[in-house]
C-alpha cells in the first residue's frame, strides 16, 4: 500500500500479536484509538445531526478520494495479493462491489474482474419509471436490464437492492414490481435485499411527509407486500436482508421493528399453508448447522432461461425441500458473446464456454485442509461441480 510515499510491508496477520498489528496500522496512518476516531468525525457528525449534510456526504468527506491517508495500489499489487491469498491461512473467498446499474458496462466489469470481484450489488430500487423519476433515480428499466445481462455474461453473481414504499409507490404496485424483478427474463437476480423506505430526518422525503404526498405504509400494508414478495421468490433467489441498519431513534416514522423479517416470514408461512404453495426462497430453506443424512439428499436441477443465458441451479435438497448446498451454472448464448466480442474486443469468455458463478454448501466452515462430518465435508460441493461439468459438456 502507498501511504504518503512510504512503502509498508504487508504483514501476515495470522501470525502477529495484537501489538504488532496495531503498530502496522499506526505506520500506515490508520488510527485505532476510539477517542481519536471520534474527534476526527465529530464535526461531520454534528452537520448530519443538524441536517446540513447527508450521511453519504459525510462519508465522502471523511473517507473519499481526497482524504489525505487514502491508500492506493496498482493492479500489479492486487495481482500479487491474489497469489498470496491462494495459500493463505485465512483466505478471502469473495469480493462484493456495490454500484448503480448505469455504472455497469464492459469496461467497469473488466476492472471488477481484475480486482477479484465475485458479486455485484446494484441499487435497482424499482422497475417503475414513474417511481424512479419521482425518487430522482436516473436509471431506466432498460438500463437495469442491460446491467443484469452484462453481469451474467461476465460471470458475476447479481445482488439487487429493491425498496418498498418509495415516493409515488402503492402496496399493490410494489408487489407487482417485485414479481417482475423475479420473473422477467431480463432481470432474475441471484440475491435480493428488500428494504422498506425509511423516513430519516434531514432527507428530501421529509418535505413530502409534511405535505402529505408520501406516508409510510402501516404494518399490515408493509408486511403484506414483503410476505407477497417472499412467496413470489423462485428457488434460485435468496432474500439476504429485509431491513436497513438504522437505529429506531433515527427513524421519524414507519417501521422500527428489528424483527421485521420474523413477522414477515410468519405471515408468509401462513399464506403458504393456506394456499398449499411452499416457500421456495433460498434463505427460508437453508439447513445451516442442522444435521443431515447424506442418503436423504437429492440432487435437483432447476433450469431456467434469462435474456442471454441458460441457467442451471443445482441444489442438494432434503425430502422437505430444505437446501444443503447449491451451484449456479451459466451457459451464455453464443451469439450474445460473439456480439459483445465484435463490439467490445476482448471478453472474459469465448462462445461455447460455460461458467460456474457460485458454489455454496451449508454447514460449519472447516479449517483449510481439515475434515469433518457436516455438509461441507461429505463431497456435496465436488458432486455439484461434477454434475455441472456433465451438463456443460452435453450442452
Can you say where each PLM-predicted feature lies in the sequence?
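Conserved non-cysteine loop/helix-boundary elements of the Radical SAM core domain that shape
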Residues: 1-159, 163-220, 224, 374-378
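Glycine-rich phosphate/pyrophosphate-binding loop shared by adenosine-nucleotide-utilizing enzymes
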Residues: 321-326, 342, 351-354
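C-terminal accessory regions of radical SAM enzymes
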Residues: 213-336
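Conserved acetyl-CoA binding element of GNAT-fold acetyltransferases
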Residues: 350-376
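C-terminal interaction modules of eukaryotic adaptor/scaffold proteins
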Residues: 394-395
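Aromatic/hydrophobic pocket-lining residues that form π-stacking "cages" and hydrophobic walls in ligand
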Residues: 147, 229, 388
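Structured core elements
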Residues: 96, 119-123, 191-195, 238-240, ...
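Conserved acetyl-CoA-binding loop-helix of GNAT-fold acetyltransferases
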Residues: 372-390
